[in-house]
């Protein structure tokens, strides 16, 4: 639920989007509300937040409506010679968004995913773990062996991205699977290139070789709800599948202390911690998810790292993974200081060998960092750009 304000009046709104939307949810963001139709007795709110203004454009929030856009304006553009479109097609125990049949009688099974996370020229999906998306992808890979032409269509709903990458930071299992089972759909007509040349083009662009065709297209929407297809083919980059499967990278841990306290921190002795927010920067070249989950536990663990002494006192703890090819924890520590964080001297930085720009890996903030747009933009820059640089 989102609480909107019209002047001094608070309006509770349903948000029909399963993502985390961390790039959008800041006070003062302009929403587009749609009054719920009469007769819906189960509705808990009178309005639905169907869109948000972001970078002077409208970003749709109603992810399910991507299917309607696909049916009306996208599918015929990306799959040639379609003559039949059947929505919500059931096959065995599974239901797929569309079954399409082309003029040659080829049966196309299609799943549509709305993509609203676009930063630094890179669109990513999903922005929260999606077991359902993984299940559909695995089913499509199996069905492709039975003669179906299988597709996943990512409908990018704002901005002008240069490429699409599966989001290995928030759902590495899905990202690895998409790279394994998928290939970038060929934007060139079949008569212009042989299958071999098309495959060479895909491989050169990191497009994968799996059986499921992966499409990314750009939909632009106005504040009246009217949409048009701005680009039928956005480059699909599946080259980071091995990184997604490696479970390696960096992380930030956001910790809230409700009260000021004195804490004994191993060899550092007793440290005075003010009430407020702290962010810890770390890395793991293997078992990244386990490392983060260990930090999030307050009990039942031996104290190995400095952070282990702090987390039992936390009111809230949040892990922010950043999959990466390189160790970036010192770079992240520098970023935290640049954002105004106050270092806790030598905390977590004993292996930095006294790096002058890295006095600590733990920084204090008076306000919640994830509520600071500059902090979120830094996180997204590392996820969309820096972490993916070799």
Where are each of the predicted segments found?
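Flexible glycine-rich surface loops and low-complexity tracts that mediate binding to linear polymers
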Residues: 27-40
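Non-catalytic C-terminal interaction segments of nucleic acid-processing enzymes
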Residues: 144, 150, 155-157, 162-247
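Aromatic/basic micro-patches that form nucleic-acid/chromatin recognition or nuclease catalytic surfaces
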Residues: 242-243, 286-375
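GIY-YIG nuclease catalytic motif and its immediate N-terminal context
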Residues: 235-297, 321-324, 367-390
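Conserved catalytic cores of phosphodiester-cleaving nucleases, focusing on short active-site segments
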Residues: 70, 96-127, 140
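Short aromatic-glycine-enriched beta-strand elements
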Residues: 1-2
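Acidic-basic catalytic patches of nuclease active cores, encompassing PD-(D/E)XK
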Residues: 22, 55-87
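Beta-strand/loop nucleic-acid-binding surfaces
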Residues: 9-23
């Amino acid at each position: 639920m989102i609480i909107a304000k019209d002047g001094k009046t608070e309006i509770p709104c349903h948000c029909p989007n399963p993502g985390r939307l961390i790039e959008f949810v800041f006070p003062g963001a302009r929403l587009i509300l749609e009054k719920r139709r009469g007769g819906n007795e189960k509705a808990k709110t009178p309005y639905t937040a169907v869109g948000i203004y972001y970078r002077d454009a409208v970003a749709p929030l109603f992810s399910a409506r991507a299917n309607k856009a696909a049916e009306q304006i996208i599918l015929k553009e990306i799959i040639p010679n379609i003559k039949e479109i059947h929505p919500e097609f059931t096959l065995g125990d599974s239901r797929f968004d569309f079954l399409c049949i082309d003029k040659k009688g080829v049966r196309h099974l299609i799943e549509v995913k709305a993509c609203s996370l676009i930063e630094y020229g890179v669109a990513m999906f999903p922005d929260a773990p999606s077991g359902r998306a993984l299940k559909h992808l695995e089913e499509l890979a199996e069905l492709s062996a039975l003669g179906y032409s299988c597709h996943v269509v990512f409908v990018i709903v704002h901005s002008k991205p240069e490429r699409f990458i599966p989001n290995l930071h928030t759902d590495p299992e899905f990202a690895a699977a998409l790279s394994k089972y998928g290939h970038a759909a060929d934007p060139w007509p079949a008569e212009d290139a042989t299958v071999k040349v098309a495959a060479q083009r895909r491989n050169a662009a990191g497009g994968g070789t799996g059986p499921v065709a992966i499409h990314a297209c750009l939909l632009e929407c106005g504040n009246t709800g009217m949409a048009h297809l701005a680009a039928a083919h956005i480059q699909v980059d599946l080259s980071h599948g091995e990184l997604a499967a490696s479970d390696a990278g960096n992380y930030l841990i956001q910790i809230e202390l409700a009260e000021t306290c004195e804490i004994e921190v191993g060899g550092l002795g007793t440290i005075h911690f003010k009430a407020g927010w702290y962010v810890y920067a770390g890395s793991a070249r293997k078992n990244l998810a386990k490392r983060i989950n260990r930090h999030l536990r307050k009990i039942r663990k031996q104290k190995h790292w400095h952070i282990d002494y702090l987390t039992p006192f936390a009111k809230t703890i949040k892990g922010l993974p950043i999959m990466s090819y390189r160790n970036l924890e010192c770079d992240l520590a520098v970023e935290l200081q640049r954002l105004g964080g106050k270092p806790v001297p030598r905390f977590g930085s004993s292996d930095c060998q006294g790096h002058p720009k890295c006095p600590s890996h733990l920084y204090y903030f008076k306000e919640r960092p994830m509520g600071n747009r500059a902090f979120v933009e830094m996180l997204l820059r590392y996820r969309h750009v820096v972490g993916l640089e070799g």
